Every structure is written in structure tokens, then in C-alpha cells.
């Protein structure tokens, strides 16, 4: 019984979203709404938008914000440099950017309010927001109860 509690505590320390890094060899089995990654990459943006859930579809139909356009330019530049063998770090505050097929394979550092969290984009992230993978809060690890655990216990005389 205690071992399962210890395992749960260990999971809590890791965070409730554990980074599932799936190797590129397994990407061939990926399907998004019945389409392979290659089909998604070759698909025009209008057709891709039709595959997304309503919230993301509505957001992209309205057009990209200027910050999102800048981020896409950085991503395209990083892809070109990666083909030449150079590694470029992409840092962004755009937590509300929807992950598109052209972002797959890159590591984007997303700001969580304190630091930049590296997020490796796999095909399974398509359609989600960047901010979903860079949590802004820590999971609470409560201390042990006792003296000085609360404000009211500060005035109790220690023995």
C-alpha cells in the first residue's frame, strides 16, 4: 500500500504532464484525423484548419497575431539552418500559439512566467497550444504539520 503512495508522490514531483518524447522512428504510425504527418505538411493551411477542433479553428480563421507571425518566421529560419547543420534556440512568450505541422521536430523554449521551458514538438502535439506544455505553477508539496506550520502556531510555546 505504501509503495503505491510513494509512486504517486514520485509522479507528483515529476509533474502531472510528463514529457512524452516519442522517437522520430515511431512518427510513421501517427495519424491526425486520419491524415499522416506528410499529408499534413503538404496540405494547404485552409484544409488543415478544417481538421482542427472548434476553438483552434476559430482562432486561426481570424488570422495570426503579429507575434505569432514572427514566431513562424523564426521557426522557418530555424528549419533552414537545421538543414545546414546549425542549431538555433527558439524562445517565445507566445503561449497561445497553436502548434502547426511545420513546427514538428523542433524544440521551442516557452516562457512560463519565470524561466523558459524547453518543449520538444512531436506530431502528437499538433492542434494544442504551446502553453499547455509549459506549466506556470508548481504542484504543491505540503510541509509536515507542527510548530510554525501555520500562523496561529507561532505563538505556542515550544517545549
UniProtKB/Swiss-Prot annotation:
InterPro entries: Ribosomal_uS19, Ribosomal_uS19_CS, Ribosomal_uS19_euk/arc, Ribosomal_uS19_SF. SUPFAM superfamilies: Ribosomal protein S19. GO terms for molecular function: rRNA binding; structural constituent of ribosome. Keywords: Ribonucleoprotein, Ribosomal protein, RNA-binding, rRNA-binding. One of its GO terms (cellular component) is cytosolic small ribosomal subunit. It comes from the Archaea. One of its GO terms (biological process) is translation. It holds the Pfam family Ribosomal_S19. PANTHER family: RIBOSOMAL PROTEIN S19P FAMILY MEMBER (PTHR11880), SMALL RIBOSOMAL SUBUNIT PROTEIN US19 (PTHR11880:SF2). Protein S19 forms a complex with S13 that binds strongly to the 16S ribosomal RNA. Belongs to the universal ribosomal protein uS19 family. This is Small ribosomal subunit protein uS19. It comes from Pyrobaculum arsenaticum (strain DSM 13514 / JCM 11321 / PZ6). The lineage of its organism: Archaea, Thermoproteota, Thermoprotei, Thermoproteales, Thermoproteaceae.
